[in-house]
Amino acid sequence: RAAQGQLWLPGAIASALAAGDEHAQTPALSEQLRLQGDHLARLHDFHGDHLGPRIARKHQAWLLESLTVQQAISAEDARAWRQTFNRLESAEAQVECLRKMTDALMSASPTTAPTIQIPSQLCPQMSVAA
């Protein structure tokens, strides 16, 4: 459970142990988001079009919680992204929403918890469940 939302954690711990370091290093935000994109694609491939998007929702929620703790995103923005992501029914829409979230986060100031466009402004053309 410690790795929920922190896909990079097992590898970082292994690297730290191999190097004799007492602290695992948190990767850059861009690397965390890249790993989430890979993970999302694999989830969809493994679980298929019906279960994949449903299972991906909790994984995305864990990522957003982790990013909130890291102060990479505000709790309010994380909540808005989660609500939007949870309404998406297709793998394609989820991947596109993650891409737009990644773009928004990467363009925000790295020194503060960013305030980014709310998902409905970024993903208006995506099909969402009513």
Residue ranges with predicted function:
Residues R1-A130:
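Alpha/beta catalytic cores of nucleotide-metabolism and tRNA/nucleoside-modifying enzymes
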